[in-house]
UniProtKB/Swiss-Prot annotation:
Protein name (Swiss-Prot/TrEMBL): High osmolarity signaling protein SHO1
Residues exposed to the Cytoplasmic side: 1-37, 89-96, 141-336
Top-rank lineage group of the source organism: Eukaryota
Gene: SHO1
Alphabetical list of InterPro entries matching this protein: SH3-like_dom_sf, SH3_domain, Sho1_SH3
Amino acid sequence: MPVYGSVSSPSLRKMENGYGHGQRASLSFGRIIGDPFALATISIGVLAWIIAFVSSIISAIHGGFPNFAWWTLVFMFFCIAGVTVTVASDAERTYHVAIVGFLAAGLVFTTSSVNSLVYSPIAPFEAAAAGYILLSMIAVRDCISSSLSQPATNAPRPQIVWIFYYGSQPQASHRAFVDSYALHKEHPGSRSSRPISHGYTNRPETQVASQAPQMYTSAQLNGFETSSPVSGYPGGPAGANGRNSSVPQFGGMPNNGIPNAATPTQDEAHQQEASIEYPYRAKAIYSYEANPDDANEISFQKHDVLEVSDVSGRWWQAKKPNGETGIAPSNYLILL
């Protein structure tokens, strides 16, 4: 297995390609246009709010319009705006719990407003009721036909659709199906059921990655060589290999004096891994399957308990109960 910190690691390349710690995603309405589900539901919500707002003004002119319906309009305006901003900034997974809570309250408000308006024989009140029903429904044609005949008590509602979408985990089958049509979202493959995180940061430095041995040639030492063997360097004292042996020095230093890249051997890598302490324990809240192209990552199942060496950054160096070590995404783990 490649040592941690290897520049060939795909995970390290992902973390170094412009994703810094605390960096916020930019606001882009292209994410809404490229997501058919978000584009359709937000468009219906905006249209419904405009219809309800204009109809409410006309109804208030005739008199007898319930004041509670105005609060519903204000609340739903901020709900629609909040969903729009979170989708445009790709922050749905960060704020999905808050979105579900606000939409649940909005569902109560809209249905209460519909109940206060839909039974009125006054035309502006019926138009306002149609707008509020549309705020609670996913299909425009169902709303129009139902508002002309009877209250659409059994019609699907966009709050319910949004609550069902944002209240489900990313690996849910219906949410994965909806996300598969979005252009900006990474489509989950058949091998993986994990949510996608876009906020990468630098991998926490470990003893293996942060302690690169310093190599010196005999000419550089210029008489300061030690006469006793040095632990961890094959061939005895430093500089002895160049004089008495044909074995390349540690780090790929051949006898011709041309240095190669310093790469630790397998035994030394295992020794350094064994010296790493794992003072933290974390429980997996999602299943994770390691990237087959990156030998540094480890796979684990939901509810697995891992030992963690460092909890800084988005990737943690962890050890499984069977002794396997590697890196794991921190947003799949919770500290115990």
